Amino acid sequence: MSNNIRIEEDLLGTREVPADAYYGVHTLRAIENFYISNSKISDVPEFVRGMVMVKKAAAMANKELKTIPRKIADVIIQACDEVLDKGKCMDQFPVDVFQGGAGTSLNMNTNEVLANIGLELMGHQKGEYQYLNPNDHLNKCQSTNDAYPTGFRIAVYASNQKLIDAINQLREGFDRKAKEFETILKMGRTQLQDAVPMTLGQEFHAFSVLLNEETRNLHRTATLLLEVNLGATAIGTALNTPEGYQPLAVQKLAEVSGLPVVPAEDLIEATSDCGAYVMVHSALKRLAVKLSKICNDLRLLSSGPRAGLNEINLPELQAGSSIMPAKVNPVVPEVVNQVCFKVIGNDTCVTMAAEAGQLQLNVMEPVIGQAMFESIHILTNACYNLLEKCINGITANKEVCEHYVFNSIGIVTYLNPFIGHHNGDIVGKICAETGKSVREVVLERGLLTEAELDDIFSVENLMHPAYKAKRYTDENEQ
């Protein structure tokens, strides 16, 4: 063995492993076998932490049940803390996020890294597994089929909380704009046609409420991840675990993670079923749908500036065209739209992978993980990007907004209780044909007085409509 390599052995024979690597031969083979995306497990630190938490919880349970020597358990726990508390070896998880084997490559990567950290703590060299073994000690009372999905669930839950934080900050940004724009009267639109007036503040407040609904939905679905199959081992029969291990390991995981994890109701079902991932990613898809709709609205409201709605101005961030001078595009809402499309596509991936399970195991969890972590990551970044580069800098074109209101035909709807729907149709048709305002036509036809129109079309009443029509007190009154 040279200074640059060490020799390790597995089922398939011996291999040379870089001497300074904390991973071992199993990880080396995975690197060679799966060169798919150039995205590594190290790029998802929450996943690394989730797996290490599982190993720490297992070591604590094994120590208490005396299934491994106390000194070995203590070293494993200390090695886990080196990663969890100090961030040691976070770059030692080079396995591609796309991997066959239901996650065995990541499970063994974790076992090897922790074993080699532990060996150094014991005063031994990396790879001297006769003292601390990745399989016999780090993987004690575990299988990839319970360790991997449990670590995955912990990781997705933690990542989900970061996304919720980002959504809340974006929501607060919309709230600030809602307050800023609360007195700006504008035209509401349905089917892209003039409807009735509202305030720009109300429009932005609706965006905020919409996002608040999504945080509640994400919270609700994320609780499904807290039911874990740790202790199930290979297929859910708890093979090679002592009595009491499964509930104890889950209890220790709750202590280590600070999360209220609970044992799955049926370990065989939990080991093969991926329904929770479908539900959680469905919530991500729903957020993407809503967020994309908001961005569509922002692009429409800022369209122009001369031949569009031009009700709001988005921050000018970069030149918009290589041929058209002075053109500036809504690039941030556009990129958020694209993020949302990708998340919606990922949802199809998760659905198909969850369906692809066979008998007692679903081997497609790695691609579910890739899709879920990507969706959460890009949605989190998109929320911050939209807030910082767009929402915070939006300004309103008050005069344009009010011009649309007072020159619209839609405000005739306010007159329905006074002149009736049929007269409203006639007024609207005349306005459309002649270009006259609703006020002009109503006065010409003698349907209402100037004073009555002033009251009905007051800014206050247009912003906050009050019922001003007749109320009937006698049943016989016509």
UniProtKB/Swiss-Prot annotation:
The positions flagged as active site in the entry are: 321
- One biological process GO term for this chain? tricarboxylic acid cycle
UniProt entry tagged with the keyword Iron-sulfur: no
Which InterPro entries does this chain map to?
ApsA (IPR004708), Aspartate_Ammonia-Lyase (IPR051546), Fumarase/histidase_N (IPR024083), Fumarase_C_C (IPR018951), Fumarate_lyase_CS (IPR020557), Fumarate_lyase_fam (IPR000362), Fumarate_lyase_N (IPR022761), L-Aspartase-like (IPR008948)
Answer yes or no on keyword Lyase: yes
GO MF assignments: aspartate ammonia-lyase activity
Residue positions binding L-aspartate:
104, 143-145, 190, 322, 327
Reaction(s) this enzyme catalyzes, per UniProt = L-aspartate = fumarate + NH4(+)
> EC number(s) for this protein?
4.3.1.1
What do we know about how this protein assembles, alone or with others?
Homotetramer.
Functional description taken from the UniProt entry: Catalyzes the reversible conversion of L-aspartate to fumarate and ammonia.
Family recorded in the similarity comment = Belongs to the class-II fumarase/aspartase family. Aspartase subfamily.
According to UniProt, the name of this protein is Aspartate ammonia-lyase
Species of origin reads Serratia marcescens
Give me the gene this protein comes from.
Answer: aspA
